[in-house]
């Protein structure tokens, strides 16, 4: 949606430690965060797009669950990711 394939690969390499490792929690959170940021810009222009707003809420919920899982499993990786993405928590 908002990222090209090259940008996605760069994110996977940075947070997944290899090009194949796209399932790691940090990678999923970063990709969701980028999609959420793109949709926030979209909603500044299209205020009545309620179908996409529902998708945004689902993405925010999924990111919240992934962050809770990461916090429960490894607090140091969670803290580093929150600081790197500049998320409020």
Curated annotation (Swiss-Prot):
CDD domains: Ribosomal_S15p_S13e (cd00353). GO terms for biological process: translation. GO terms for cellular component: cytosolic small ribosomal subunit. SUPFAM superfamilies: S15/NS1 RNA-binding domain (SSF47060). One of its GO terms (molecular function) is rRNA binding. It comes from the Bacteria. It holds the Pfam family Ribosomal_S15. SMART domains: Ribosomal_S15. Keywords: Ribonucleoprotein, Ribosomal protein, RNA-binding, rRNA-binding. InterPro entries: Ribosomal_uS15 (IPR000589), Ribosomal_uS15_bac-type (IPR005290), uS15_NS1_RNA-bd_sf (IPR009068). Part of the 30S ribosomal subunit. Forms a bridge to the 50S subunit in the 70S ribosome, contacting the 23S rRNA. Belongs to the universal ribosomal protein uS15 family. One of the primary rRNA binding proteins, it binds directly to 16S rRNA where it helps nucleate assembly of the platform of the 30S subunit by binding and bridging several RNA helices of the 16S rRNA. Forms an intersubunit bridge (bridge B4) with the 23S rRNA of the 50S subunit in the ribosome. NCBIfam families: S15_bact. This is Small ribosomal subunit protein uS15.
């Amino acid at each position: 949606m908002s990222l090209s394939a090259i940008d996605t690969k760069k994110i996977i390499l940075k947070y997944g430690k290899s090009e194949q490792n796209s399932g790691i929690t940090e990678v999923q959170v970063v990709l969701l965060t980028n999609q959420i940021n793109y949709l926030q810009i979209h909603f500044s222009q299209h205020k009545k797009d309620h179908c996409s707003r529902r998708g945004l809420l689902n993405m925010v919920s999924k990111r919240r669950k992934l962050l809770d899982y990461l916090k429960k499993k490894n607090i140091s990786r969670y803290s580093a990711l929150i600081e790197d993405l500049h998320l409020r928590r």
